[in-house]
Amino acid sequence: MTAEGAFPLGAATTTIMIIRGINPIFATLGGFVAGMLAGAVSGFMHTKMKIPALLTGIITLTGLYSVNLLVLGSANVSLSGHNTLVTMVTGLGLSKLNGVILLGLIFVSLVVFMLVVLLNTQVGLALRATGDNLAMGEANGIKVDRMKILGYMISNGLIALSGALLAQNNGYADMNMGTGTIVNGLAAIILAEVIVKYLPLGKRLWSIVVGAVLYRLVLVIILAMNVDAQMLKLASAILLAIILYVPEVRQKLKIRPNKSLTPGGDK
């Protein structure tokens, strides 16, 4: 749940920093850091205060609404007339579409590269072990509480970074930008798992990117079918339910090996 508060937090922080004359690159990093701080708060409440994860997310989301409003000063703030990453790229002669695609590829490539490097270090392996099997990680001497907090910080930092980039693409920051962030993220991950499985870490991260693009593409197709925009959330929910059900269908339709071809089978 923290994700839906961290997303607009990154957008709000970056927008205000840009308006105050800070370089868009540093402003974008500022949004990332703000998200990490929000994640640290969630991680602290969950690990040290022993508040359940779901309640932690709800509490942080509720608090971040006021924080975001305090940062922005109003429900939405425009970046019109200010220099952003998008205007910097379009200033090189690229169209806005090509510039946004270029920025997206650059940031996605950097994030994937840095995550692959991090998750293959000793700290990264401890982080992965904590996520895969908490009890086993703790039994092997891993300080799981620290790893949880680190995981909260990294994930919410990246979510806030996404909000910072979207604000610069749209030209404004809005209090409600984070609505649906969790659904979109889950859909991208699950769709990637449905399409391909058992990939190395780097390729798995890229498959999630592809899943996110495919999910948004399907939503665009739904809108192109003259579906009422008010029904888009319902369509998203139905689509997510279908995506979640696909693995179950595949399991039911899975063809079992012929007994005659298995060791000990009839000849």
Which residues fall in each region the model found?
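Helix-loop-helix "hairpin" substructures at the membrane interface of multi-pass membrane proteins
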Residues: 23, 38, 96-178, 182, ...
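Alpha-helical transmembrane segments within multi-pass membrane transporters and channels
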Residues: 22-62, 211, 215
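Loop-to-transmembrane alpha-helix initiation sites
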Residues: 53-54, 100-105, 148, 177-184, ...
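Transmembrane alpha-helical segments in multi-pass inner-membrane proteins
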Residues: 159, 163, 169-234
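Cytosolic-side transmembrane-helix boundaries in multi-pass membrane proteins
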Residues: 132-139, 143-146, 203, 218-267
